[in-house]
Amino acid sequence: TGFRRSIDELKIEDFLEVYNTNVFGLSLFTKEIVPFMKNQKSGTIINIGSTASLKGYATGSIYSSSKFAVRCLSQCWQAELRPFNIRVCQVNPSEVTTAFANPERVERDEVHNKLTPKEISHAIISAIEMDNRGFINELNVWATNPFN
């Protein structure tokens, strides 16, 4: 969920819509699964962030700040859950050819220089498959040449 608005056009309702999904929804879901992972004394949580969580951009106040919040939650949960052998990894994709920005949720055609869900799934699988002795705290997945 994302809104592109300049600072003078920001509305609290837009912040709430994005934060309800990206921050509060993630937090509530994670709160529900953590007891099961603690009980089994292991687990891996993958949070999908965005490269927007690494650096803000013009008209990105709402979306970027929500992904910065996800990044902070991931870091807090890493520290909190490591004693229980629960790994938390945040995956930060750059632009991916999905229906993300389409209000009708129509999938976009694959673009030769943008990432696809396949690349992101490979990153997620690599983080999950790592031996439990280690964990990847954050993966930044960039399109090689998105400007071509």
Predicted regions and their residues:
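A short helix-coil junction within the Rossmann-fold of NAD(P)-dependent oxidoreductases
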Residues: 5, 32-41
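Residue(s) in the substrate-gating loop at a strand-loop-helix junction
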Residues: 50
